[in-house]
Amino acid sequence: MPKMKTKSAAKKRFSFTATGKVKAGPAGKRHGMIKRSTKFIRDVTGTMILSDADAKIVKKYMPYDR
């Protein structure tokens, strides 16, 4: 049976912590930031840990990165 392929879109957007949790950058900061509040801009910086349900889906896309 051939090896499974990693989804290219997933490997560009997600990374794993040492404990196996999935990290991602929050959405909503590409454009239109002038009309956003300062609190919103501050809250969407950095990375966040995905929920268990979302992490399960992402792990299927990246079979060899854990």
UniProtKB/Swiss-Prot annotation:
Transmembrane segments: none
A cellular component term, taken from the record's GO annotations: cytosolic large ribosomal subunit
GO biological process: translation
GO molecular function: structural constituent of ribosome
Pfam family, one: Ribosomal_L35p
Entry-linked InterPro entries: Ribosomal_bL35, Ribosomal_bL35-like, Ribosomal_bL35_CS, Ribosomal_bL35_sf
UniProt keyword list: Ribonucleoprotein, Ribosomal protein
Cited HAMAP family: Ribosomal_bL35 (MF_00514)
Family: Belongs to the bacterial ribosomal protein bL35 family.
Name the UniProt record assigns to this protein: Large ribosomal subunit protein bL35
Source taxonomy: Bacteria, Pseudomonadati, Pseudomonadota, Alphaproteobacteria, Rhodobacterales
Protein's gene: rpmI
